[in-house]
Amino acid sequence: MANYYDITLALAGVCQAAKLVQQFAHEGQADQAAFETSLNTLLQIYPEDTLAVFGGKAQNLKLGLETLLEQMHGTGSDLSRYWISLLALESKLNKDPHAKAELARRIQYLPTQLEHYDLLDEQMLSTLASIYVDVISPLGKKIQVTGSTLYLQQLAMHHRIRACLLAGIRSAVLWRQVGGTKWQVLFSRRKIIAMAKQIYSSL
């Protein structure tokens, strides 16, 4: 039987990353706490459980849970495209052993770099963006990010958006690992909504 608690947390992680992409693209800034939570998921290689990936607190997924509930009710076309595309890219990643191995290799190197840089430093964001461009982008159709030209022309914003997309892939991988399937998104929305509301009400 599907564990909708874990599935919902992971899906909220995907939605949180998608929402951050939207915020950066339209506003040039994003929810800083949510951004840090999402980036930190990339460092959780051997988590104790699903919640541990997100810092052990459901509160860290507040933005993601809000976004997930909005999405399950069908609002926000850009957002829908982002998180659905992330799930699709993860599916392609899962079928590509070479890409999976390369992603694991690059991710395992991150703690070494963190000895020299903070996770939110430009150098680290550039590194995360490079992993996305080198490993994830070639797997499928490019995710077209829409927003303000003012922000989308900035290299630093490209780094933030791609770092968020990489974090979205991390949550999508987790979603698959805990039993998430596209059929649940299509046919079990009530269960996902009910669980998201239950988790959100406990924050």
Curated annotation (Swiss-Prot):
Signal peptide: none annotated. InterPro entries: HflD, HflD-like_sf. Keywords: Cell inner membrane, Cell membrane, Cytoplasm, Membrane. The keyword Lyase does not apply. It is found in: Cytoplasm; Cell inner membrane. The keyword Magnesium does not apply. GO terms for cellular component: cytoplasm; plasma membrane. It is a peripheral membrane protein. Belongs to the HflD family. This is High frequency lysogenization protein HflD homolog. It comes from Pasteurella multocida (strain Pm70). The gene is hflD.
